[in-house]
């Protein structure tokens, strides 16, 4: 089996999304800001509309998803904020290698949107740019849709999901709207909000640190929470998966393995003084505003000064959360987050952004 991915419209800007030291909070029903004003970052929000889900991040990039029959396929409509943005429509499904063809067709209420496959993997194809908005509106108003001949798509909830995006981005009654277009010009759509700025701390030599043959300092071993993790993993290979890094001349980072499952490994992270002294749990915020010291499938990249994590919802990695936090010299700031809550076969490259920074 391989995943066939079909793409239409303009490619979006990079999907990285994440908050600063603290994730944003606020009223999830906040109205879109007026055009011509300086726009503040908005709260990241996820909504369910019958069979569809919709997500908008703190930069107001928005994504809507619907499932294909059998849970082996999906369709996505994505659009950046601002009057100049145009939607992207993507669809994918699992198919046997022998069944893959050089083209595929998205059909909505009898209207065909041919797509020619590219050579990359997963296989991708594009509807011509000039038909992307047409296809998105057809999904919003349609009764039946399918990919190829055999993959029926649910449109139950599509209209509500796309209307919510129109409202969130201030597109209602404009020529750019997905669900409720009108005569107002694109210039009346609010400008994108300003994204938080995160500046990494200077790089630091890493001699003696890393993810191989690291010995946890005594000051960390003495912590009750660490002792609990060590007891949990005492008879497991993951007990040796201690990681460390130098953050600056007086600050170190240590990761303690706490559990291992079939496809997920958990660590708790601590910021310490030299030699592991004075340990305190790292604060790793999420786009929802919650924070913890733990990661799943985490690691530290010293050249970027980032902790990354990829919490899989299941083994094939088609759902879950992918996060990045950057060390600023004072704390770890959330800089990117992608989260796909439904296990519909969506590859991470097509997951919705839930937080972005610059």
Identify the residue ranges that each predicted region occupies.
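Exposed beta-strand-loop-beta-strand "reactive/processing" segments of non-cytosolic proteins
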Residues: 242-262, 267
């Amino acid at each position: 089996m391989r995943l066939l991915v079909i793409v239409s419209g303009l490619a979006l800007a990079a999907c990285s999304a994440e908050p600063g030291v603290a994730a944003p909070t606020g009223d999830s029903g906040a109205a879109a800001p007026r055009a011509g004003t300086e726009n503040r970052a908005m709260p990241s929000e996820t909504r369910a509309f019958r069979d569809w889900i919709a997500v908008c991040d703190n930069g107001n990039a928005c994504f809507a998803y619907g499932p294909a029959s059998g849970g082996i396929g999906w369709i996505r409509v994505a659009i950046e904020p601002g009057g100049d943005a145009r939607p992207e429509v993507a669809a994918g499904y699992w198919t046997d290698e022998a069944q893959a063809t050089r083209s595929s067709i998205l059909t909505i209420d009898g209207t065909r949107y041919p797509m020619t496959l590219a050579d990359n993997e997963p296989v991708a194809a594009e509807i011509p740019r000039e038909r992307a908005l047409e296809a998105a509106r057809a999904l919003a108003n349609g009764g039946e849709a399918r990919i190829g001949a055999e993959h029926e798509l649910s449109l139950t909830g599509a209209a509500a999901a796309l209307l919510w995006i129109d409202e969130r981005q201030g597109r209602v009654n404009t020529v750019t709207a997905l669900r409720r277009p009108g005569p107002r010009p694109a210039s009346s759509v609010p400008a994108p909000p300003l994204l938080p700025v995160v500046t990494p701390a200077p790089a630091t030599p890493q001699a003696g640190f890393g993810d191989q043959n690291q010995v946890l300092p005594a000051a960390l071993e003495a912590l009750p929470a660490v002792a609990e993790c060590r007891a949990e993993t005492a008879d497991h290979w993951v007990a040796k998966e201690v990681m460390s890094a130098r953050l600056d001349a007086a600050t170190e980072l240590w990761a303690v393995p706490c559990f291992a499952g079939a496809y997920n490994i958990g660590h708790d992270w601590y910021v310490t003084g030299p030699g592991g002294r004075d340990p305190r749990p790292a604060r790793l915020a999420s786009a929802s505003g919650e924070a913890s010291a733990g990661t799943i499938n985490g690691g530290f990249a010293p050249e970027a000064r980032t902790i990354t994590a990829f919490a899989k919802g299941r083994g094939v990695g088609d759902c879950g959360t992918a996060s990045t936090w950057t060390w600023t010299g004072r704390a770890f700031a959330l800089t990117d987050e992608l989260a796909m809550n439904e296990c519909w076969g969506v590859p991470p490259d097509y997951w919705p952004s839930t937080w972005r920074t610059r």
